[in-house]
Amino acid sequence: MVKRLVVTAGEPAGIGPDLVLALSKEHWPHQLVVCADKKMLAQRAEQLGINVTLLDYDASTAPSPQQAGTLVVEHIDMPSTCVAGQLNEENGHYVLKTLERAALGCMKSEFDAIVTGPVHKGVINRAGVAFSGHTEFFAELSNTPLVVMMLATEGLRVALVTTHIPLAYVSKAVTAERLQKIIDILHRDLVEKFAIAEPKIYVCGLNPHAGEDGCLGREEIETITPTLEKIRQEKGIHLLGPLPADTIFNEKYLNDADAVLGMYHDQVLPVLKYKGFGQSVNITLGLPFIRTSVDHGTALDLAGTGQANTGSFRTALQHAIELVEKKQ
């Protein structure tokens, strides 16, 4: 059965529109609907020398596979002109409107998944909206109390206990309650969305050497280890850890792990991006819909040049399609 996926082009001055237009050259097995300003896409296509037919989205028609050389567009009006590579605060609210339209469409089953292009947090905040990222935006919009940020590339999945908070706040944020909820969501979605019957989750410690018996910090002793033991006993989830972050990423562990759970953003993401930059995908777990995204930013210096690497966007789209097809 043909499904309908919605794609947000992201920050209009960045490479998001370039990526969407580049992939319009190809055939895809499901319908792709792009939430963006149609005129902006037409202008960028001309700038890039891409010959594409922009079609108006009609929700009343049945979805059909994406045909090469075409792009179905749900037009969201952009209030100000856009120059590739130049941020414009007047378009900050426009970006959020594209995200809102896509998410609400998924929540009412109009769309089967969201694939998001990169946004610029700074320009949205300067437009007067407190915005810390897609993950938090979709969680609030869908009234989801807690979501899990996971990134994946070939041979490695990493998830986070905390996301976009200052490093100084991480220790207090890693509570037994939060850790248990994060593991519940991660385990459930590995089973339900990734079709892994008995997931093996490997858990990082917070401190160097996982605290080294309390000499380098007591979070492992007081919070992480007791919580993992409780979850193992009560729910039978396969958990290994806490393990030192500087040793968990070796073949001995990774060959057996379905996911690695890190305590904070820069503990695990540098490893994943080193392993698969340009070929990795951001997946939000715990939402009432499937959401994948690129693993990079807006790359303003590349916008409109035709030099943007489509690898991560392609991976995000392929992952979304795989997850949608597993639901069938």
Swiss-Prot record:
Quaternary structure, from the entry: Homodimer.
Top EC group: oxidoreductase
A GO BP entry: pyridoxal phosphate biosynthetic process
Note: The active site is located at the dimer interface.
Family: Belongs to the PdxA family.
UniProt-annotated binding residues for a divalent metal cation: H164, H209, H265
Protein name: 4-hydroxythreonine-4-phosphate dehydrogenase
Cofactor binding note: Binds 1 divalent metal cation per subunit. Can use ions such as Zn(2+), Mg(2+) or Co(2+).
Protein task: Catalyzes the NAD(P)-dependent oxidation of 4-(phosphooxy)-L-threonine (HTP) into 2-amino-3-oxo-4-(phosphooxy)butyric acid which spontaneously decarboxylates to form 3-amino-2-oxopropyl phosphate (AHAP).
SUPFAM superfamilies the UniProt entry points to: Isocitrate/Isopropylmalate dehydrogenase-like
